[in-house]
């Protein structure tokens, strides 16, 4: 026996058979051990051959295991020594002769199996005969498997049934009803059929953006081939999808990948046009299997493609086609491009209507038609970085999954009731141990309350179970209906018209009627929602994008109508600005905003400290309940010409290309937010050129060529231009003249095309002395919040309020000096008192003003007088 004459798999099986004999304690290495490992093989080559030869591989395996169990076992010193049985030596000899006779260079698995069946004296041969296997039938099965090929390499078995291993039969999947229906796309399917019908270079490649339905077109072609809805040249063809991952996986040695691919191509060529090969992600062919000196997959395909022996359909994206396929001109010319564009909104609605039944059956919930329309329109508007119909299908799928999860979960009403029952039962057990009259009286009341709750809970549980069962019944009926429709289609193809008639006019209408009855009995007051509606779709969109597109609740409508009042509580004395921002938000939430522009773009002009940035923070807190939920870009960081790249990302070839831009990345991650460009006049003029597209079209292309959507953002720019005019404006003077002076400066600094795109330019007036009291209240509310954890309560009387307002008012600097006054006059003394222990946690501190100083609980603090800075330590430190 020359081991080198055996293929790698046969060597592996012989080694496994020897290990089995040693493990079982058998002294002889018999043909039974070989038969056992051959039948245990996960790929099932030997088992498949036995079944094809008319035998029963499972029965033979069971009989082999029983025979091995009866073999004598050796333990002790003689264990572990295995001798070759004469029958095994005969089997190896017969296998080598059979291989030589067939012209094989190597002994393969099937030759070894044939040798076992030829030896009628061995127990393995007798078991094969009893199992219905004859050498003649087995030889015929081997020849059918080999298709005239000889074993010329140590991995020859990899070439057997290559298409079964490395491809998926789409026509069979269509026959089994595993493919989703394909709606529309008639033009693309017709163009694909036209290219396939050519004499040479009959290989279409479907090129389109990800998610537009390239693979679906091929599945549609498989369904058409199955239904005979194709020209004569394509009738009865098989459409197989090549699995590149399976081809490459496990190919350890050089040449193994090429051998597998060549085996696939040989089978396709041998079919003489009967097989069309579909290669999804076709760009993976270029460079696949490439190693030093080896050919890649695309070079192996080229000759067969050029001769027209290989019918092939490719599919890839525009970017990948340009990057990989177009560079290889010899490969590109062998394929005929078929461009697949994104379907229109109307076409996508039709596609979703065709898929609806499959998704209803899978999730066990009903999907309303309004939900399908909402999925298409909302995904088209708000999910801009993906393509129809993929994003609309994903929306429908997730909304249905979310509803199904709610149906399977206990309703909130029942859940809270059950939790209350558990709480009362714990209390009941505790009261049972008490003997005082009060506890006994409470126990009687509690038991009555508990009995009532348990009765209500039982009724609700029963009602919930009934509703769940109804949905479950509908799902089962829909699954049954789907199976019957597949059976009907197959019966019509086979010409079994009697069975087709029974199904079409009997069982199918009967099931449809039952489903209609269940759905007609929907209860408006049901505990669980039974259908996916447009609002469910809107909720999913809101989760994905952060854009509040779901239906406004009454509370939110009320909140929007009172927006000025809410923002006015934080921003004092700037009603014009607050009103302009509020109307923009209301317009957007009511759906009256131009869908191709940002929600609003404002330029806030005014002196420092009057509330420009504060209004933006208040707006972010109002919209998102978090004042940090905004992109704040300090434009003083963008004073150089090259700093524009930091906003949108560096172009290709520059350092930081992969990192993305400050502005574009923030909006891509969170499309619904406030964007604040602080101190915009300090930026380089070229920065404004970048903003032109954002303000006008609501979009911006970043350094990597991706389009970022700004249509759901609110853009605020702040500037101090012309603030000196506003500061020096006498009280009561007409603001019109001052506005004209300020606008003159703005026009001199910014270009007309930039200013023309801003929705509103709003002037912030300097703060009046009368408004300082309200600002004191706002600042004090923040200080009180800081002391909440210590339970220290501050009580500020009117005198102290007026004192702080007087000291903190400065027309040139707005409200910021007030913050410093509160810090020095209130926070600093208070901090000392807390550290000294004169103010403890939970204390009440009354703050007043007497004799021109603030008092704390009637006493002036050490630091009541604010000393001017002289460069020397304060007097109190010298005392």
From Swiss-Prot:
Region of interest: NBD2: 556-766
Residue ranges of the region described as Linker: 343-546
Gene Ontology terms, MF aspect: ATP binding; ATP hydrolysis activity
InterPro entries per record: AAA+_ATPase, ATPase_AAA_core, Chaperonin_ClpB, Clp_ATPase_C, Clp_N_dom_sf, Clp_R_dom, ClpA/B, ClpA/B_CS1
Record carries keyword Repeat: yes
Record domain Clp R: where: 3-148
Residue span of region Disordered: 858-879
The entry's keywords: ATP-binding, Chaperone, Coiled coil, Cytoplasm, Nucleotide-binding, Repeat, Stress response
Region feature (Repeat 2): 84-148
GO CC annotations on file: cytoplasm
Coiled-coil blocks: 393-525
Binding site for ATP 1: 208-215
Region of interest (NBD1), ranges: 161-342
Subcellular locations according to the entry: Cytoplasm
Principal place of residence: cytoplasm
Role this protein plays: Part of a stress-induced multi-chaperone system, it is involved in the recovery of the cell from heat-induced damage, in cooperation with DnaK, DnaJ and GrpE. Acts before DnaK, in the processing of protein aggregates. Protein binding stimulates the ATPase activity; ATP hydrolysis unfolds the denatured protein aggregates, which probably helps expose new hydrophobic binding sites on the surface of ClpB-bound aggregates, contributing to the solubilization and refolding of denatured protein aggregates by DnaK.
Family affiliation: Belongs to the ClpA/ClpB family.
NCBIfam families in the record: chaperone_ClpB
Annotated PANTHER family: ATP-DEPENDENT CLP PROTEASE, HEAT SHOCK PROTEIN 104
Domain notes: The Clp repeat (R) domain probably functions as a substrate-discriminating domain, recruiting aggregated proteins to the ClpB hexamer and/or stabilizing bound proteins. The NBD2 domain is responsible for oligomerization, whereas the NBD1 domain stabilizes the hexamer probably in an ATP-dependent manner. The movement of the coiled-coil domain is essential for ClpB ability to rescue proteins from an aggregated state, probably by pulling apart large aggregated proteins, which are bound between the coiled-coils motifs of adjacent ClpB subunits in the functional hexamer.
Assembly notes: Homohexamer. The oligomerization is ATP-dependent.
Identification of the protein by name: Chaperone protein ClpB
């Amino acid at each position: 026996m020359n081991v080198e004459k055996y293929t790698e798999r046969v060597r592996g099986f012989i080694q496994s058979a020897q290990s089995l004999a040693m493990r079982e304690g058998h002294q002889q290495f018999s043909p039974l051990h070989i038969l056992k490992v051959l039948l245990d093989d996960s790929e099932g080559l030997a088992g498949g051959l036995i079944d094809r030869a008319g035998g029963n591989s499972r029965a033979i395996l069971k009989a082999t295991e029983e025979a091995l169990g009866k073999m004598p076992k050796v333990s002790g010193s003689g264990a572990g020594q295995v001798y070759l049985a004469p029958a095994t030596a005969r089997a190896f000899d017969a296998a080598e002769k059979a291989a030589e006779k067939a012209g094989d260079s190597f002994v393969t698995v099937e030759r070894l199996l044939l040798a076992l069946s030829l030896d009628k004296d061995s127990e393995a041969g007798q078991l094969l005969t009893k199992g219905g296997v004859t050498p003649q039938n087995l030889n015929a099965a081997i020849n059918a498997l080999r298709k005239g090929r000889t074993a010329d390499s140590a991995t020859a078995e990899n070439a057997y049934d290559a298409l079964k291993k490395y491809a998926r039969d789409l026509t069979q999947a269509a026959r089994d009803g595993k493919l989703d229906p394909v709606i529309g796309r008639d033009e693309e399917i017709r163009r694909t059929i036209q290219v396939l019908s050519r004499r040479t270079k009959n290989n279409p490649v479907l090129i389109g953006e990800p998610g537009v339905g390239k693979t679906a077109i091929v599945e549609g072609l498989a369904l058409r081939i199955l239904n005979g809805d194709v020209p004569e040249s394509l009738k009865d063809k098989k459409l197989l999808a090549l699995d590149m991952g399976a081809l490459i996986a496990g190919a350890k040695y050089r040449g193994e990948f090429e051998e597998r691919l060549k085996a696939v191509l040989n089978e396709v060529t041998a079919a003489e046009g009967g097989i069309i090969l579909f290669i999804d992600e076709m760009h993976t062919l270029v460079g696949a299997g490439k190693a030093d000196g080896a050919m890649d997959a695309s070079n192996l395909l080229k000759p067969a493609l050029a001769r027209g022996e290989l019918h092939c359909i490719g599919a890839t994206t525009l970017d990948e086609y340009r990057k990989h396929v177009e560079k290889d001109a010899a490969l590109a010319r062998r394929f005929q491009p078929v461009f697949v564009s994104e379907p229109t909104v109307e076409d996508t609605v039709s596609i979703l209507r065709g898929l609806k039944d499959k998704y209803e059956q899978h999730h066990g919930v009903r999907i309303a038609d309004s939900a399908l329309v909402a999925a298409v329109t909302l995904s088209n508007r708000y999910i801009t970085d993906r393509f129809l119909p993929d994003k609309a299908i994903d929306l429908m799928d997730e909304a249905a999954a979310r509803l199904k999860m709610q149906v399977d979960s206990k309703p909130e009403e029942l859940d809270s009731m059950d939790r209350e029952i558990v709480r009362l039962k714990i209390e009941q057990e505790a009261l049972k141990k008490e003997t005082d009259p009060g506890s006994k009286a409470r126990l009687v009341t509690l038991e009555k309350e508990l009995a009532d709750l348990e009765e209500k809970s039982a009724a609700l549980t029963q009602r919930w179970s009934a509703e769940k069962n109804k949905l479950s019944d509908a799902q089962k009926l829909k699954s049954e209906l789907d199976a019957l429709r597949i059976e009907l289609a197959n019966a019509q193809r086979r010409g079994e018209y009697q069975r087709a008639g029974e199904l079409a006019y009997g069982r199918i209408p009967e099931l449809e009627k039952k489903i209609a009855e269940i759905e007609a009995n929907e209860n408006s007051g049901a505990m669980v929602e039974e259908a996916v509606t447009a609002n469910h779709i809107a909720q999913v969109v809101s989760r994905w994008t952060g854009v509040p597109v779901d239906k406004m609740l009454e509370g939110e409508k009320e909140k929007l109508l009172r927006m000025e009042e809410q923002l006015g509580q934080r921003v004092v004395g700037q009603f014009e600005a607050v009103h302009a921002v509020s109307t923009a938000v209301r317009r957007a939430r009511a759906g009256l905003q131009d869908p191709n522009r940002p929600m609003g773009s404002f330029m806030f002009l005014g002196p420092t400290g009057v509330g420009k940035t504060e209004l933006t923070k208040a707006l972010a807190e109002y919209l998102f309940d978090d004042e940090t939920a905004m992109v704040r870009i300090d434009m003083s960081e963008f004073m150089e010409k090259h700093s524009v790249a930091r906003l949108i990302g560096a172009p290709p070839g520059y350092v930081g290309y992969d990192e993305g831009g400050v502005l574009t990345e923030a909006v891509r991650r969170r499309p619904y937010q406030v964007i604040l460009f602080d101190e915009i006049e300090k930026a380089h003029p070229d920065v404004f050129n970048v903003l032109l597209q954002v303000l006008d079209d609501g979009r911006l292309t970043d350094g990597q060529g991706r389009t970022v959507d700004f249509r759901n953002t609110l853009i605020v720019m702040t500037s101090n231009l012309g603030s000196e005019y506003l500061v020096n404006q006498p009280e009561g003077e007409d603001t019109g003249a001052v506005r004209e002076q300020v606008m003159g400066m703005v026009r001199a600094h910014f270009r007309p095309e930039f200013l023309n795109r801003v929705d509103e330019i709003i002037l912030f007036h300097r703060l009046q002395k009368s408004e300082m009291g309200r600002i004191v209240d706002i600042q004090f509310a923040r200080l009180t919040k800081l002391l909440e954890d210590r339970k220290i309560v501050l009580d500020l009387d009117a005198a102290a309020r007026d004192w702080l307002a007087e000291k903190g008012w400065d027309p040139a600097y707005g409200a910021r000096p007030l913050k410093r006054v509160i810090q020095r006059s209130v926070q600093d003394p208070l901090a000392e008192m807390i550290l000294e222990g004169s103010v403890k946690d939970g204390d009440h501190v009354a703050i007043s003003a007497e004799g021109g100083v603030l008092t704390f609980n009637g006493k002036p603090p050490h630091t009541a007088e604010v000393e001017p800075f002289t460069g020397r330590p304060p007097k109190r430190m010298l005392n």
